Amino acid sequence: MRQWTAIHLAKLARKASRAVGKRGTDLPGQIARKVDTDVLRKLAEQVDDIVFISGTNGKTTTSNLIGHTLKANNIQIIHNNEGANMAAGITSAFIMQSTPKTKIAVIEIDEGSIPRVLKEVTPSMMVFTNFFRDQMDRFGEIDIMVNNIAETISNKGIKLLLNADDPFVSRLKIASDTIVYYGMKAHAHEFEQSTMNESRYCPNCGRLLQYDYIHYNQIGHYHCQCGFKREQAKYEISSFDVAPFLYLNINDEKYDMKIAGDFNAYNALAAYTVLRELGLNEQTIKNGFETYTSDNGRMQYFKKERKEAMINLAKNPAGMNASLSVGEQLEGEKVYVISLNDNAADGRDTSWIYDADFEKLSKQQIEAIIVTGTRAEELQLRLKLAEVEVPIIVERDIYKATAKTMDYKGFTVAIPNYTSLAPMLEQLNRSFEGGQS
């Protein structure tokens, strides 16, 4: 009776929330969990395969690629594709999408929510994308966060799908007896080298890791005297192109995709790894990968007549560097709109922008840079310190700042952080209404 009440109140809350113009992604779960504290556990027990997707960057793209591919092949799933990746949002997804025929759940999960959610749900497999410095006032340093995750997932019989090229992710191999690695061959692609480096010390002995090849940051082929090393990948990218959309060679199969950004190659590979481990073949995966387009502010493309735009979320140095690199790959003039908020969901500490490589903007052909958000002035200062010699315009209103990019002929590169994403994306949708996206 308690479960029935929780589910029905949650569904009513969803309808009410949407009726007043809100998304209703977290509220139903919050209400249900108050009525029945075991509601998520009970619903999860009805599903055969539960896949958790986590990591600092790329969770949403990886999750959506998996979800889209399964749906494209007529496989019914539970999927929190609206981005609510904490306990309440995950509960909402199970409540709204559970049916007797649904036997697979694809769940993006916030790194900080793993200990809480795993008290209620044990996934059959977890895939980790990467670990970079993100919101340190929320999660603490990377070493602490990774150790906490390893402790939480140990001895639960979870199959771990790990990025072999990231030593932080590879450390999680101590938490399971069943490990599948994915990675990228040396020289598969020449990533731009960043001035930002994460710790490259061995998690076993503390010595400096030796790198045979570096893709970017700490991502690459590494080894240590103590025996810790980059493991052989079962699923591997041998080469890929991006101009700006991805053309991947994974295990000798070609994938012509509609997502941009070289960093997304790892996200596509993570999704591929999950899908293969779920039993899908290459052709089935190709059906999904080659029809996937982003509509959630992750490398989302817009075009109306001669005006073009691209938006990509950036909430840490690695994400910002990736977004700035996309601008470098675009020919001709650009106009940037960059937003920095410091709301609770963003993390109050915005000092991470000083670790991002804004200096690379000086090499691009830029008409103007519009900075916006609650910390617009701090962005302005950071760009001045980077000696970016282009007009820098401060407009704290995100809607107005985004709309202003339409006054310029160049390609709009829009880079919001977490709570900036919704208003910036909304304005781009308005500005490009009737065009291509």
Curated annotation (Swiss-Prot):
Kindly report, in one word, the top-level EC class recorded for this enzyme: ligase
Knockout: what is the outcome?
The gatD-murT double mutant displays susceptibility to diverse carbapenem and cephalosporin beta-lactam antibiotics and shows increased susceptibility to plectasin.
- UniProt KW keywords: ATP-binding, Cell shape, Cell wall biogenesis/degradation, Ligase, Metal-binding, Nucleotide-binding, Peptidoglycan synthesis, Zinc
Q: How is activity influenced by pH?
A: Optimum pH is 7.5-7.8 for isoglutaminyl synthase activity.
GO molecular function annotation: acid-amino acid ligase activity; ATP binding; carbon-nitrogen ligase activity on lipid II; zinc ion binding
What EC number is given for this enzyme? 6.3.5.13
State the pathway, as annotated in the record.
Cell wall biogenesis; peptidoglycan biosynthesis
UniProt xrefs under InterPro entries: Lipid_II_synth_MurT, Mur-like_cat_sf, Mur_ligase_cen, MurT_C
Q: Which residues bind Zn(2+)?
A: C202, C205, C224, C226
Family as reported in the entry's similarity comment = Belongs to the MurCDEF family. MurT subfamily.
- Which PANTHER family does the UniProt record give? LIPID II ISOGLUTAMINYL SYNTHASE (GLUTAMINE-HYDROLYZING) SUBUNIT MURT, MUR LIGASE FAMILY MEMBER
Quaternary data: Forms a heterodimer with GatD.
Role this protein plays: The lipid II isoglutaminyl synthase complex catalyzes the formation of alpha-D-isoglutamine in the cell wall lipid II stem peptide. The MurT subunit catalyzes the ATP-dependent amidation of D-glutamate residue of lipid II, converting it to an isoglutamine residue.
What HAMAP family does the record point to? Answer: Lipid_II_synth_MurT
- Name under which the protein is recorded: Lipid II isoglutaminyl synthase (glutamine-hydrolyzing) subunit MurT
The organism of origin for this protein: Staphylococcus aureus (strain N315)
